[in-house]
Amino acid sequence: EAKENERRWNEDKFDAKNQDPTNHYDKTRMKLNFEIGPDGKVHPLGYQEKSLEVRLQERLTELGWKPFKPDSKIQPNCCAKFIFGGNHDRTLEMAFGSQAVNLDKGADNSHLQRCPEIKQWAKDIYDWCAKRYGQKNIIGFQVHLDESSPHIHALVVPVGIRPKSGR
């Protein structure tokens, strides 16, 4: 899943993904995808050297998270994945303004440029996540503009303090 959020795909993987009729990844819009890094700034998608899985494990190690038992069939959840979206037409407008977007599979949308409004929308949601869960607990925050509707994937470690144990 992390490879999909970060689009760490080669051409073969990309083509295989698009064989599924429910998928709609536009190669010509992939360059418009971005993520917000730990510094709160916009960066190209996949700019971080470490993958989501590695960053998640590092954060869990920092927190001292341990599964119930190594051989247990039931394990505690260690992260939450949020997908933020909105009205299809409105999110397209935020992303591309009045530019013509062709949503047909295989269409050439290489002329499109990302509009500032989509970056501000993403930053606002990032700020909300940081305030709610803590900036250090945001493992990944990717914005996809290469699918049918623009949306955000946020992976967070929901850290809280237990009243009885204080941990």
Regions found by a protein language model. Give the residues of each.
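N-terminal nicking endonuclease/strand-transfer module with a His-rich metal-binding environment
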Residues: E1-R167
